[in-house]
A protein has these predicted regions:
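P-loop/Walker-type NTP enzyme "switch/lid" segment
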Residues: 1-63, 67, 162-163
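Structural beta-sheet core signal
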Residues: 9-10, 59, 81, 115-117
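Inter-motif core of Ras-like GTPase G domains
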Residues: 66-87
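Inter-lobe coupling/hinge region of RecA-like P-loop helicase motors
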Residues: 159-181, 185
Length: 195
């Protein structure tokens, strides 16, 4: 999106430094930097302010229940919760996440929550079956956060790009690059975001 002249801001609400490290690598590799803001605690007012000055605001919340996560849900437009379907531990977190989302939707009824299946190794039948089974389970009951149709494969290019501070659309040549780009483009399209 940054490469297409979209104004993008990242709000870092997680205390680890992954996003800052990623953005520093972007700069070192001559890629367009993405403004990163940091805020902790109740982040709802900062989100409202930042939404006014950019086209796309990405909020990086901790991967566990937190004040940051709960307050972000009250003002966010879209929630993506990433789950590796073959990991029982990750799939089991959906009960708790769904509860938090449904509570937040009482305040923010426009919130669109989605489950994104990630790191699916399509060469392993067990991984494919786990994705199919979890998809079916979630779709059987609308109380669950619903899964997106788009799925992200376990491709080395995603990690390699990230390690360079890039996204797959910043990369010129790599194995499985066209597949990775297509998956990201399908995700953006499904979410109604023009990359």
């Amino acid at each position: 999106m940054v490469n297409n002249s979209r104004t993008v801001i990242i709000l870092k609400t997680d205390k680890n430094n992954d996003i800052l490290s990623w953005n520093e690598k972007r700069k070192q590799n001559g890629l367009l930097p993405v403004p990163v803001y940091e805020e902790y605690g109740d982040v709802s007012e900062v989100i409202k302010r930042l939404k006014k000055i950019c086209e796309v605001l990405i909020i990086d919340c901790p991967g566990h229940d937190s004040k940051e996560f709960r307050s972000a849900l009250t003002v966010a437009d879209i929630l993506l919760t990433l789950v590796k379907p073959s990991s029982d531990f990750e799939a089991e977190t959906l009960t708790h996440v769904t509860e938090k989302v449904r509570t937040a939707q009482q305040i923010n009824p426009d919130l669109q929550p989605w489950v994104l299946f990630t790191r699916i190794n399509t060469t392993k039948p067990r991984h494919r079956k786990a994705a199919i089974d979890l998809d079916k389970l979630l779709r059987e009951n609308p109380v669950w956060i619903q899964p997106l149709r788009t799925r992200i494969s376990d491709l080395d290019i995603f990690e390699a790009a990230c390690n360079e501070g890039a996204g797959v659309h910043d990369v010129r040549r790599a194995s499985s690059l066209s597949t990775a780009k297509a998956q990201i483009e399908l995700l953006a399209q499904e979410l109604g975001i023009n990359p």
